[in-house]
C-alpha cells in the first residue's frame, strides 16, 4: 500500500508542507485579478467595482475570504520548483469553483459542481483553463480518497485548493467561488451569450431550465429553446446549458460546455460598457466569494484587453482515465495513472516537458491504483 494513506496512528502524508505567508504578491495581484475577469463572468463584473466604490460608500461588495493559509497544503518540492524554476516563473494559478447553491450559502457545506484551474502567463497575457472532472477519484488532502468535489463540501475553498495542490503539484492560494444564480444574473447583465446549440441539447436545456426554476429562488421567465444553431442564450438558458450531462460525452462534455460559456461571457464582457459591467456586478456580487479584495481591484481598468484564453482542456485526459463504480464512492472518474496525467498537465499549463512529479503525487498515484484496480480489473475480466 502506498505510504501516503492515513494509518491508524494518525501519521499523514510525507513530502508536503504548509504554505507560508504569501510572498511577493503586490506586483502580481493586479494581473491575477485581470485574468480572473477574463475567465469568469462574475469576475468580469469586478472590473466595475472601482467605479462602484468611487460613487457610493453604501454598496456592499462580494464576500471576501479570509482564508486560513495553514490549511492550504502545497507539496514541498512544488514550493521549491515554483520559486526556483525559470520555466515556472511568471505564472499564477487560481481555482474557480461553481457551487450548486443559490441562496448565498456558497462558502462551505455544498459540493463544487464545477472545478476549474486557470493559469495565466503574466508575461504574455495567455490564459489556459483546465476543468477537473468533479467525480475524479483523488486524495481530498487529508489522505482520504473519494470524489474530488467532496473537498469543498468538507473544508470549503481551503481544502479544495489543498486537494488540487496535493494531487496536481500546484501552488494555488487564490480562488473565486460563485453560485448558479450569479451565472444567471451575470449572463443576463451582459446581454446574453452566443452558443451553438445542437439538436440533442435542446430538450435538456429546456428540462434543466424548469428544474432550476423549481428548485431555486431564481424567478426568470421560462423561454424555451426551440431551434438548433448559433444563438443568443439568456442567463437561465446558459445556466441550464452548463448543467447538461446526459448526452454523448457525459460529464466530459458538460465540462467542455462550461468552459464554452466562460469564453462566451469573456467575449461579451470585452464588448460591454463600464455602466453595463457596473450594473451586472451589483446584481451578482452577493453570490461571489473570493480572496480578491477591494484594494486589488484598482488595477483592473484599461488592462483587460491584454489577456486572452488560448487553451482549454479537461483533467484527467480522456486516454488516461476510466469510469467505474468504486465501492461506496459510487461512479467515479479514475485517473488510471495520476502521475502521468500530472506530467501532461504541467506541459499544457506551463510548457514544461518531461515534468518530474513530486513524491506526494507519486504516492497518491500509487494509492489510487491500489484502491481502484480491483474494480477496474473486474470489469475487464
Name these PLM-found stretches.
Residues 3, 16-17, 21-124, 299-305:
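Entry/capping segment at the start of metal-dependent catalytic domains
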Residues 69-84, 91, 140, 287-381:
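C-terminal solvent-exposed extensions
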Residues 89-92, 110-115, 124-132, 143, ...:
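Extracytoplasmic
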Residues 97, 103, 135, 163-173, ...:
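Structured segments of extracytoplasmic/periplasmic soluble domains
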Residues 103-106, 146-154, 169-174, 228, ...:
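Second-shell loop/turn segments in exported
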Residues 108-112, 142, 151-159, 177-181, ...:
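Soluble non-cytosolic domains of exported or imported proteins
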Residues 150, 154-219, 271, 291-293, ...:
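Amphipathic, coiled-coil-like alpha-helical scaffolding segments used for oligomerization/assembly
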Residues 188-276:
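Flexible, polar/acidic helix-loop-strand segments at domain edges
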Amino acid at each position: 500500500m502506498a505510504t501516503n494513506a492515513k494509518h491508524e496512528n494518525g501519521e499523514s502524508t510525507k513530502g508536503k508542507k504548509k504554505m507560508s505567508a504569501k510572498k511577493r504578491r503586490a506586483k502580481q495581484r493586479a494581473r491575477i485579478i485581470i485574468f480572473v475577469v477574463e475567465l469568469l463572468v462574475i469576475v468580469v463584473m469586478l472590473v466595475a467595482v472601482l467605479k462602484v466604490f468611487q460613487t457610493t460608500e453604501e454598496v456592499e461588495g462580494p464576500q471576501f475570504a479570509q482564508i486560513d493559509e495553514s490549511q492550504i497544503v502545497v507539496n514541498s518540492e512544488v514550493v521549491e520548483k515554483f520559486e526556483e524554476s525559470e520555466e515556472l516563473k511568471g505564472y499564477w494559478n487560481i481555482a474557480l469553483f461553481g457551487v450548486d447553491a443559490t441562496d448565498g450559502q456558497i462558502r462551505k457545506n455544498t459540493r463544487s459542481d464545477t472545478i476549474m484551474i486557470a493559469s495565466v502567463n503574466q508575461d504574455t497575457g495567455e490564459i489556459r483553463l483546465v476543468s477537473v472532472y468533479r467525480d475524479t477519484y483523488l486524495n481530498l488532502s487529508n489522505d482520504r480518497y473519494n470524489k474530488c468535489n467532496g473537498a469543498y463540501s468538507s473544508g470549503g475553498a481551503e481544502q479544495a485548493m489543498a486537494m488540487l495542490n496535493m494531487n496536481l503539484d500546484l501552488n494555488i492560494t487564490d480562488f473565486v467561488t460563485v453560485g448558479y444564480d450569479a451565472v444567471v444574473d451575470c449572463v443576463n447583465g451582459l446581454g446574453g451569450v452566443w452558443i451553438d446549440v445542437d439538436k440533442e441539447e435542446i430538450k435538456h436545456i429546456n428540462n434543466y431550465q424548469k428544474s432550476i426554476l423549481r428548485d431555486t429562488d431564481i424567478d426568470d421567465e421560462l423561454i424555451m429553446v426551440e431551434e438548433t444553431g448559433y444563438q443568443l442564450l439568456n442567463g437561465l438558458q446558459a445556466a441550464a446549458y452548463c448543467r447538461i450531462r446526459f448526452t454523448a460525452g457525459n460529464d466530459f462534455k458538460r465540462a467542455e460546455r462550461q468552459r464554452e460559456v466562460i469564453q462566451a461571457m469573456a467575449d461579451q464582457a470585452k464588448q460591454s460598457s463600464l455602466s453595463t459591467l457596473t450594473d451586472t456586478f451589483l446584481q451578482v456580487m452577493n453570490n461571489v466569494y473570493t480572496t480578491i479584495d477591494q484594494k486589488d481591484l484598482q488595477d483592473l481598468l484599461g488592462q483587460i484587453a491584454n489577456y486572452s484564453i488560448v487553451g482549454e482542456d479537461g483533467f484527467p485526459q480522456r486516454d488516461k482515465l476510466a469510469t467505474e463504480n468504486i465501492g461506496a464512492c459510487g461512479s467515479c472518474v479514475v485517473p488510471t495513472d495520476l502521475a502521468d496525467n500530472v506530467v501532461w498537465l504541467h506541459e499544457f499549463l506551463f510548457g514544461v516537458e518531461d515534468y518530474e512529479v513530486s513524491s506526494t503525487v507519486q504516492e497518491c498515484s500509487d494509492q489510487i491504483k491500489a484502491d481502484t484496480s480491483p474494480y477496474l480489473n473486474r470489469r475487464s475480466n
